[in-house]
C-alpha cells in the first residue's frame, strides 16, 4: 500500500500497485518510490491549498496552479430572492454551455415559488444544489456558499445573478480571464435592459444607462477591460475571499464595494472583463426602486464611517438634492433657499426630453431614496456613537 496525493483533487489517496513482480527487489523499490513521489511532485503547486490556511499572503495566492486546474475546481453560485421567472431561462442558458459545472442556488427567503422551482430543477440536474440562506441578506448567502465551497476543495467561485442575461460560455471564459490575468477577482460591466418595450422596467433600464442613473460609474458602462478598483462581482479566488473574511455582513448593501476596497488594500488585483458584459433586468416598480436606493444610501453612510474616506461627488449629489428640497418651505423667508431645488427640478424636466417622463420620475425617486437614506444613516451612526460614549 502506498500513501500518496491525488494531483487532481489535492487530497490524500491510497494507491495499490506491484512493480516487476513485487517489492523484494531493488528495482521494485525504485519503481515504488518513483510512482509514489510523482503525484506528490505534481501536486507541490497545491501545497498551500492542501496544508490549509497557514499564514496566507494575498500577494502570493495566485500561483502556477492556474495552469493545471479547470472547470472542475470552480462552481457557480446564484443568490436568489423572489426571482422564479428568471431562474429557468438562466439555468437553460448556463447548461447549454457548461452542462457539468456545479451550480448552487442560494435562496434568501423567497415567497414567490423560487424555492419550489429550484427543488424541481435539482431533481432533474445532479449538478444543481439548493442552499437556504436563513439570514436572508445577500452577503450572508454568498459567504455561506463560499465557506462550503472552500471546504469542499473548490478554488474559484463564479457569481451570477438570476435577473440577468449572460453570453454563451460565460463561466468558462470568465475563469480563463481570471487565470490568464493572474487576478484575485474579476468584475464585469453591468448594463441595464428590459423585458418590456415600455413600462416602468423599460424606464428604469433607460435611467440606469444614463448619467442620471449610474452617476458615470465606470462599471455601469462598457468602458472596456483593464485593472480597476471596483466593479460588478463575477469571479473570486476562494482562498482570497476566505482570507479577507468574505463580505461584511453588517452592511445592508454595498458589501461589494467594501470587499473590493479591502482586497486592494491587502495587495490584491481586480480585472474588469469588458468583453463579458452582463445585461440585467432592474426593478420595475417605483416603490421597489425607492426601497433599494434607501437601503443603498444607509449602507453607503455605514461604509463611509467604516473606511473614514471622503465620498465621491456623484454620491453626495443626491444628498444635496434632498437637502435642497427640504429648504423649499423656508424660501418665503430667504428666497435664495429655493435655488438648489429649482436647479435640480429644472434638470429633471430637461432630462424628460432625452429619457422620457417615467425615467425622469424614477430618477427623482431614486435620488430622494438614496439621499434621504444617506442622511438617515449619518444621523443613525452619530446617535449610536453618542450613545456609546455615554454608556
Name these PLM-found stretches:
Residues 92-101:
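Short, acidic, metal-binding catalytic loop of nucleotide-sugar glycosyltransferases
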Residues 107-116, 164-167:
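A conserved acidic beta->alpha catalytic loop
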Residues 133-151:
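Glycine-rich, basic loop-to-helix element that forms the pyrophosphate-binding segment
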Residues 154-165:
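Short beta-strand-to-loop acidic/aromatic patch adjacent to the donor-nucleotide binding site
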Residues 169-202:
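Conserved donor NDP-sugar-binding/catalytic core segment of glycosyltransferases
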Residues 216-236, 252, 278, 309-311:
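A recurrent flexible, glycine/aromatic-enriched loop bordering the glycosyltransferase active site
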Residues 248-311:
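Catalytic donor/gating beta->alpha subdomain of glycosyltransferases that bind UDP-sugars
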Residues 321-385:
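Membrane-embedded multi-pass helical conduit in multi-pass membrane proteins
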Amino acid at each position: 500500500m502506498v500513501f500518496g496525493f491525488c494531483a487532481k483533487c489535492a487530497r490524500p489517496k491510497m494507491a495499490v500497485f506491484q512493480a516487476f513482480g513485487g517489492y523484494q527487489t531493488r528495482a521494485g523499490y525504485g519503481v515504488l518510490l518513483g510512482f509514489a513521489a510523482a503525484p506528490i511532485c505534481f501536486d507541490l503547486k497545491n501545497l498551500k491549498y492542501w496544508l490549509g490556511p497557514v499564514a496566507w499572503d494575498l500577494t502570493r495566492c495566485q500561483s502556477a496552479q492556474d495552469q493545471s486546474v479547470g472547470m472542475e475546481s470552480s462552481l457557480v453560485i446564484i443568490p436568489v430572492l423572489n426571482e422564479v421567472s428568471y431562474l429557468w431561462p438562466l439555468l437553460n442558458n448556463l447548461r447549454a454551455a457548461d452542462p457539468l459545472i456545479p451550480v448552487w442556488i442560494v435562496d434568501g427567503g423567497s415567497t414567490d415559488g423560487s424555492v419550489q422551482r429550484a427543488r424541481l430543477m435539482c431533481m432533474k440536474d445532479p449538478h444543481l444544489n439548493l442552499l437556504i440562506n436563513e439570514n436572508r441578506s445577500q452577503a450572508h448567502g454568498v459567504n455561506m456558499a463560499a465557506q462550503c465551497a472552500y471546504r469542499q476543495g473548490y478554488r474559484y467561485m463564479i457569481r451570477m445573478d438570476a435577473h440577468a442575461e449572460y453570453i454563451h460560455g460565460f463561466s468558462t471564459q470568465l475563469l480563463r480571464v481570471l487565470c490568464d490575468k493572474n487576478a484575485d477577482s474579476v468584475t464585469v460591466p453591468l448594463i441595464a435592459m428590459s423585458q418590456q418595450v415600455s413600462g416602468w422596467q423599460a424606464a428604469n433600464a433607460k435611467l440606469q444607462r444614463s448619467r442620471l442613473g449610474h452617476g458615470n460609474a465606470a462599471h455601469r458602462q462598457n468602458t472596456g477591460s483593464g485593472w480597476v478598483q471596483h466593479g460588478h462581482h463575477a469571479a473570486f479566488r476562494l482562498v482570497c475571499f476566505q482570507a479577507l473574511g468574505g463580505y461584511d455582513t453588517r452592511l445592508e448593501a454595498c458589501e461589494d464595494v467594501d470587499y473590493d476596497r479591502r482586497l486592494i488594500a491587502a495587495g490584491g488585483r481586480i480585472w474588469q472583463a469588458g468583453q463579458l458584459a452582463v445585461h440585467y433586468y432592474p426593478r420595475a416598480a417605483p416603490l421597489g426602486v425607492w426601497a433599494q436606493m434607501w437601503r443603498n444610501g444607509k449602507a453607503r453612510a455605514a461604509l463611509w464611517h467604516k473606511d473614514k474616506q471622503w465620498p465621491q461627488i456623484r454620491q453626495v449629489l443626491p444628498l444635496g438634492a434632498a437637502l435642497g428640497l427640504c429648504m423649499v418651505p423656508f424660501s418665503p423667508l430667504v428666497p435664495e433657499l429655493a435655488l438648489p431645488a429649482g436647479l435640480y427640478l429644472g434638470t429633471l424636466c430637461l432630462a424628460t426630453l432625452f429619457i422620457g417622463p417615467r425615467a425622469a420620475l424614477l430618477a427623482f425617486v431614486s435620488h430622494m431614496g438614496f439621499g434621504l437614506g444617506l442622511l438617515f444613516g449619518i444621523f443613525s451612526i452619530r446617535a449610536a456613537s453618542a450613545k456609546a460614549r455615554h454608556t
